[in-house]
Amino acid sequence: MPTNEKKLLDEDDDTLDCVKTIGNELHFYGEITQENTLEFVEAFKKLEIQLLKHKADLIGYEPKIRVNIMSEGGDVYAGFALKNILEKSRVKVVTIAQGACCSAATFMFLGGSERRIGTNAYLLIHQISTEMWGEYRDLKHEMKNCDKLMRDLKKMYMEKTDIPDRKFKKLMKKDLYLSAS
């Protein structure tokens, strides 16, 4: 590989980068993990600071960050963290679902102050899933935690979307892809 080409592979673990910055756009194309979340937050904060500096220099300039998301989901807590970061931005954030935006990736999508779905793109929301083994009391405790997470997810979707309660319950029963149309 010529030295002037940007390497796509991380030298440490041979994984593809999932976050790219192009102009005022961030592209998150990958699994929602703690590591990818940290990579995104670093790129997002750098871009946010850069745009805020432009705002200070240019009268009337209102910065905007466009976040393109293509992800089949991943870690629920990493998804919550991404949503929180976007919501707390000092710059307007437009989230755009590209391709598939599923599961925990939809939390990131909801973090935008403006949300769009690309042509031929789909969203998927569903019940949480978990794995566990252990003693009966541990299983009961895990079920209580899952019940709380489901209530919190419902509250989050109800606050951020116009999905009626009946439709939300239907969506939670079976995996259905949603499009802009």
Predicted regions span which residues?
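Terminal-region recognition feature
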Residues: 1-181
